[in-house]
């Protein structure tokens, strides 16, 4: 039965391009050739091209077969599971091996012979399609095995959680009412505790130390200086605030900046604006000072023209300060007036 589709050759015969000639026509060509008919006459009689007749007769004379296909059958399959297994083993042992080296090893190990050994292109295709993904998966598994176990996640800003003066002070001092509490991990940035840092070598104070001094809260480093505060000095007498101590402090304030011991005259009030003071009484140089020792401040040797050793600023000594010399002078004056009368 002839196919329903095809092309017509130059002899008027019908053929299908790319398809072999039917077996019946092949057998008829061989029978006519055995009868002694020339190939050209067979071609005209059967309407088959001269090339097709010559090719079929030549194959029949060589192999004795009229069937189409490769002579001696197709090449057997060479990419067997055993060959693929050996190729995978070679690749795992030496990841940088070439395809032609794998081919030589297959021949050297006796896995294949020269008739069924795969070609270099076939080995490359096997490495790319079948072993490539497995090799990548093996590398990934080995990486996961050698990778250390993940550590538990730490909260933010606790990577370098080292003790610092700020956190220690915050732990000791309670938060005052009305002020929101600040977590210790967010209050101040962490500093790397190293004894070989530049600030430690040069003796420069770190930022946390400066902030701890300026902060209103009490820090451990400030506790060392608390013993030297003014609160531990004995309190001065109340009368000394308005008396001699006040004048001595004013003298220290006015004359403390004077160069070479000279007074700063421009900082004084003019003499015309000051009221005249009464003449001080004569006081014996031997008297007892009853003020608190903490209120005494040494003044400069320079004194005002109208002042006395007891009042450098020409001020009266308050009556609350009792001096034995003044009492003796007053008693002597009263006795003189009484005798005169």
Curated annotation (Swiss-Prot):
Disulphides: none
CDD domains membership: PAX (cd00131)
Example GO molecular function: DNA-binding transcription factor activity, RNA polymerase II-specific
Subcellular location: Nucleus
Record keywords, A-Z: Developmental protein, DNA-binding, Nucleus, Paired box, Transcription, Transcription regulation
Chain segments carrying region RED subdomain: 82-130
Domain of life of the native organism: Eukaryota
UniProt DNA-binding residue ranges: 4-130
Pfam families in UniProt: PAX
Chain residue ranges for the region called Interaction with KDM5B: 168-189
Region (PAI subdomain) residue spans: 7-63
GO cellular component: nucleus
InterPro entries in the cross-refs: Homeodomain-like_sf (IPR009057), PAIRED_DNA-bd_dom (IPR043182), Paired_dom (IPR001523), PAX_fam (IPR043565), WH-like_DNA-bd_sf (IPR036388)
Predominant localisation class: nucleus
Any coiled-coil regions, as ranges: none
Protein function: Transcription factor required for normal development of thymus, parathyroid glands, ultimobranchial bodies, teeth, skeletal elements of skull and larynx as well as distal limbs.
Binding partners and assembly: Interacts with KDM5B.
Protein name: Paired box protein Pax-9
Gene designation per UniProt: PAX9
């Amino acid at each position: 039965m002839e196919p329903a589709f095809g092309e017509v050759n130059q002899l008027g015969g019908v053929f299908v391009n790319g398809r072999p000639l039917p077996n019946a026509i092949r057998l008829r060509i061989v029978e006519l050739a055995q009868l002694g008919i020339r190939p050209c006459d067979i071609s005209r009689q059967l309407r088959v091209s001269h090339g097709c007749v010559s090719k079929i007769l030549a194959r029949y004379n060589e192999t004795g077969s009229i069937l189409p296909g490769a002579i001696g059958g197709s090449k057997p399959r060479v990419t067997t599971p055993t060959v693929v297994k050996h190729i995978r083993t070679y690749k795992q042992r030496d990841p940088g091996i070439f395809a032609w080296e794998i081919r030589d090893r297959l021949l050297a190990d006796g896995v294949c012979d020269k008739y069924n050994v795969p070609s270099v292109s076939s080995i490359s295709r096997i490495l790319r399609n079948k072993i490539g993904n497995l090799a990548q998966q093996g590398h990934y598994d080995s990486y996961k095995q050698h990778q250390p176990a993940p550590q538990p996640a730490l909260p933010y800003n606790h990577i370098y959680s080292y003790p610092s003066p700020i956190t220690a002070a915050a732990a000791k001092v309670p938060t005052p009412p009305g002020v929101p509490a600040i977590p210790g991990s967010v209050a101040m940035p962490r500093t790397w505790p190293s004894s070989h840092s530049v600030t430690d070598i040069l003796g420069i104070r770190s930022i946390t130390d400066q902030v701890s001094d300026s902060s209103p809260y009490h820090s451990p480093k400030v506790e060392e200086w608390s013993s030297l505060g003014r609160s531990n000095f004995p309190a001065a007498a109340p009368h000394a605030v308005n008396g001699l101590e006040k004048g001595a402090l004013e003298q220290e304030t006015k004359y403390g900046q004077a160069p070479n011991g000279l007074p700063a005259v421009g900082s004084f009030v003019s003499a015309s604006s000051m009221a005249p003071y009464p003449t001080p009484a004569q006081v014996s140089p031997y008297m007892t000072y009853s003020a608190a020792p903490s209120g005494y401040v040494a003044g400069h040797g320079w004194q005002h023209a109208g002042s006395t050793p007891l009042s450098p600023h020409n001020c009266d000594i308050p009556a609350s300060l009792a001096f034995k010399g003044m009492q003796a002078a007053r008693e002597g004056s009263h006795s003189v007036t009484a005798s005169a009368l």
